[in-house]
């Protein structure tokens, strides 16, 4: 599966199938939240939050790719990410969307 944030694939003719998306919502761990509050005081990267963002994004991408595969797509182009916190910041939601396409001649 080809994934691209561009609206084209070099030297390929594409057939548009449909818009696809992946959504993932994660809740923060209370123990990690306490440790993060200490980091807020002294500064620095909050690794547990960085890992959570990466995990949420990866899961959302996997869901989008699965939807594209179910439609018979070879690629997803024009990929966009949106992220928001919910429930007073204790929950993180990531939405990944793109256009599922079939690469002609493949």
Swiss-Prot record:
Any Pfam family the entry gives: YbjQ_1
Organism superkingdom: Bacteria
Record family assignment: Belongs to the UPF0145 family.
Descriptive protein name: UPF0145 protein CTC_01500
Organism: Clostridium tetani (strain Massachusetts / E88)
């Amino acid at each position: 599966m080809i994934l691209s944030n561009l609206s084209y694939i070099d030297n390929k003719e594409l057939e548009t199938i449909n818009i696809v998306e992946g959504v993932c919502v994660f809740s923060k761990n209370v123990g990690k939240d306490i440790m993060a509050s200490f980091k807020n005081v002294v500064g620095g990267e909050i690794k547990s939050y960085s890992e959570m963002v990466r995990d949420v994004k990866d899961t959302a991408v996997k869901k989008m790719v699965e939807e594209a595969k179910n439609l018979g797509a070879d690629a997803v182009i024009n990929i966009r990410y949106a992220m928001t916190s919910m429930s007073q910041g204790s929950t993180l939601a990531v939405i990944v969307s793109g256009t599922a396409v079939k690469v002609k001649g493949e």
